[in-house]
Structures are given as structure tokens and as C-alpha cells.
């Protein structure tokens, strides 16, 4: 569906250790530059088709509303990274766009998502795919 970056791989022990200690890992390759542009274009196209009263960023469960989003969330490279962090038995709980376009002025303070979720134990992973260069 979307071209995988040739650098996609399993997480290193160092990355898994960082996740265990700090709760995050960054800079993990998933999609090629062409695929990122395709994702950006798809986001723009989808946004333009929504009614004005629907904010694409405040709508959850896109994996249930869009086959393309569903397939995106099941990209093997992404699932491998999640498995490296929490093991092979997991489910997708949500699916949401979170667009913070360059120079839009919005601020998201540092936080860990698990404190906002009704999950117990809080053994969860957020996968954030950056498609905008902020």
C-alpha cells in the first residue's frame, strides 16, 4: 500500500531500553519519502472531503471508518515495532490523525498518553507517524 523505507528494521536493544526507561523512542524509519508524500496527499484529500463541522484531528477510530487507514495501521513494519515493545499480543484501540502543520502555533506539552486512557495495566503504545515537517 505505502512503500516501506529500506531502513525499516526491528528495534535495537538500546531503543527498547530507552522505551522502558523513558517511555518513548523516536526516529524509527517506517515509510519511504515517496510514501510520506503519498500519506500527506491522502490526508489533504480526505480533509477536503469532510463536512466543515467535522475536524479530522478530533475524530477517532479512523481505522473503522477508512479501509486505507485500517491497512495503514496494519503495516507490518509498524506492527513489528509495537511487538518489540510490548510483545505479540496486542490490539488496536484507536486510530486518529493529529496534524500539527508547520508554523500553526499550536503547542502540545510533553506528556505520556497512558495517563489519559482507561487501560489497566497501562501497557500501551502510541504510534505517531510524522508526515509534516514541523
Identify what each model region corresponds to.
Residues 111, 118-134:
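Short, conserved beta-strand element in jelly-roll/cupin
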Residues 1-22, 26-119:
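Non-heme Fe(II)-dependent double-stranded beta-helix
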Amino acid at each position: 500500500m505505502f512503500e516501506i523505507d529500506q531502513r525499516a528494521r526491528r528495534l535495537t536493544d538500546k531503543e527498547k531500553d530507552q522505551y522502558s526507561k523513558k517511555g518513548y523512542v523516536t526516529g524509527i524509519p517506517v515509510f519511504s519519502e515517496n510514501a510520506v508524500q503519498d500519506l500527506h496527499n491522502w490526508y489533504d484529500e480526505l480533509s477536503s472531503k469532510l463536512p466543515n463541522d467535522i475536524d479530522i484531528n478530533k475524530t477517532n477510530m479512523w481505522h473503522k471508518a477508512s479501509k486505507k487507514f485500517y491497512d495503514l495501521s496494519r503495516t507490518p513494519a509498524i506492527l513489528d515495532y509495537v511487538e518489540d515493545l510490548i510483545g505479540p499480543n496486542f490490539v488496536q484501540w484507536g486510530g486518529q490523525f493529529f496534524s500539527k502543520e508547520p508554523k500553526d502555533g499550536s503547542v502540545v506539552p510533553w506528556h505520556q498518553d497512558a495517563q489519559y486512557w482507561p487501560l489497566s495495566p497501562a501497557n500501551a503504545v502510541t504510534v505517531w507517524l510524522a508526515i509534516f515537517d514541523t
